[in-house]
Amino acid sequence: ITLDEAMIPFRGRIAFKVYMKNKPNKYGIRLEVVADAENGIVLHFEAYTGAAGNQANTVDDLVLRMLEPFKDKNFLVFMDRRYSSPNLFTKLRQKGFYPVGTVMKSRRGLPKSFTRKLRKGQIINRRKGDMLALKWKDKRDVFLLTTADRAEMVETGQNRHAQAGGDHETLKPAGVVRYNLGKVGVDRADQMASYYPMHRKTVKWWKKVFFGLFTMALINLNKYMNMKNGSAMRLETFLLNIATHLGNAELSTPTIPGAAAEP
């Protein structure tokens, strides 16, 4: 499963509107989302409504609350640097999860050797129990925590742009490869929602939320039906089919004898 953020577009005035530069829609209402890492089906979500209220809102509290329905089932959990920390990963292992995620280099508990500068392709690994921390130099420094991988490099295919001329195998840390595969689910669902937004500029924020969640439900249903039927129906075609069936149902709704016609 994957823990990540999604965005419901909204540019009006509201106390808990956020800005997220890496999303297709930059301004809106943020959702914390748990999704199936393989197909992107959203399993659980929570809307961010600011720091008000009695609910604990530290990053660790948020992650543990979001993952509570899935504990003790040996799930791999993918998350990005906003959530990850050695302390959180220890808590998640105690609850039966195997977390994997990029991590901020400033997080408390990371090895001091991670301050060393590396040349491209170099790597530093440090293990504590079943948690592996690594720093790897690609185009930039990559910091990763994983409880599901060994300290090894794996081949990812041919690099056709070798500087020295000729092809050579591209090697990446196993944890980085696993993370890249596991993080696509929510990103794909969020991108699909941005392609087919159900919104108008004049609606209130709560209507934005309703239509945002309605869109999420339709995307979920499209993915589920494709899995069940072994098909690959595009979301656009699926939405047109839904609209057609709803329109036909409206036209064929029988009238009640004796009922007054609406003006």
Predicted segments with their positions:
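Acidic, contiguous segments within the catalytic cores of piggyBac-derived transposases
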Residues: 1-263
